[in-house]
């Protein structure tokens, strides 16, 4: 599906995502999880296969077009402007989109940010920066939200907070979640895929997958 130079990174991938709810993508480092999200978002191109979103093939659509059509993407890397305030970062969310969600509506999901609107984003904790990145993406009113490791480097208390936020969001839109915390991912998701070396090695209902011994083997270092 996706190749970098002469090297193929993702192979024979067949996935479906519900219109509402969370689909988790699990796997060891280097399995192709982040590459998959980058490909869906349009950050990287793919040479073979198809990605169908809302009934339309996305191969020849730029990342901006996909964003306009409702695909939001929060990468693993720091996605906020540290020199700007929280409020200024939010104003940038969906700035080029015709239809934007009201900032106050988004902040209902993230009450901590409401108390830090005039604070520089660079002074926020890791968890708060993750929340800001997600909230800024939500201002574009996505139908599909791609989240790459939203709890990476986040204090355990904030992880639970992010988990609750994701569960609330999942009632209104589709989320594809790449997550290193397997228990969290399976707790919040409806369906899960496990990738291994660029392929889907296992998939099924998240509840049933928790007790499957095959999962531990696939995720073992």
Predicted regions and their residues:
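Helix-to-loop junction immediately C-terminal to a conserved catalytic motif
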Residues: 41
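Conserved ABC transporter NBD signature motif
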Residues: 49-60, 69, 99-103, 108, ...
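The feature captures the beta-strand-to-loop junction immediately N-terminal to the Walker
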Residues: 26-28
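ABC ATPase NBD coupling module
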Residues: 57-78, 115-118, 209-213
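Catalytic Walker B motif of ABC-type/P-loop ATPase nucleotide-binding domains
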Residues: 145-149
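Conserved ABC ATPase signature
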Residues: 120-124, 128
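ABC ATPase C-loop
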Residues: 137-138
């Amino acid at each position: 599906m996706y190749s970098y130079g002469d090297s193929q990174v993702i192979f024979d991938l067949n996935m479906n995502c519900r219109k509402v709810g969370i689909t988790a993508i699990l796997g060891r480092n280097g399995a192709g999880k982040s590459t998959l999200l980058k490909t869906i978002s349009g950050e990287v191109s793919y040479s073979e296969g198809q990605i169908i979103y809302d009934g339309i093939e996305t191969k020849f659509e730029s990342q901006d077009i996909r964003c306009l059509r409702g695909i939001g993407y929060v990468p693993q890397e720091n996605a906020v402007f540290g020199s700007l305030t929280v409020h200024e970062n939010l104003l940038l969310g969906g700035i080029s989109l015709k239809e934007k969600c009201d900032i106050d509506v988004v902040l209902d999901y993230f009450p901590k940010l409401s108390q830090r609107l005039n604070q520089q984003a660079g002074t926020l904790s890791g968890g708060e920066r993750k929340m800001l990145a997600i909230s800024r993406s939500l201002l574009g009113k996505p139908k599909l939200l791609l989240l790459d490791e939203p709890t990476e480097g986040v204090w355990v208390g904030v992880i639970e907070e992010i988990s609750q936020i994701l569960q609330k969001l999942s009632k209104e839109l589709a989320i594809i979640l790449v997550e290193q915390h397997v228990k969290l991912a399976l707790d919040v998701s409806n369906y899960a895929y496990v990738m291994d070396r660029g392929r889907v090695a296992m998939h099924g209902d998240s509840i049933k997958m928790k007790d499957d011994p095959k999962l531990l083997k696939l995720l073992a270092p």
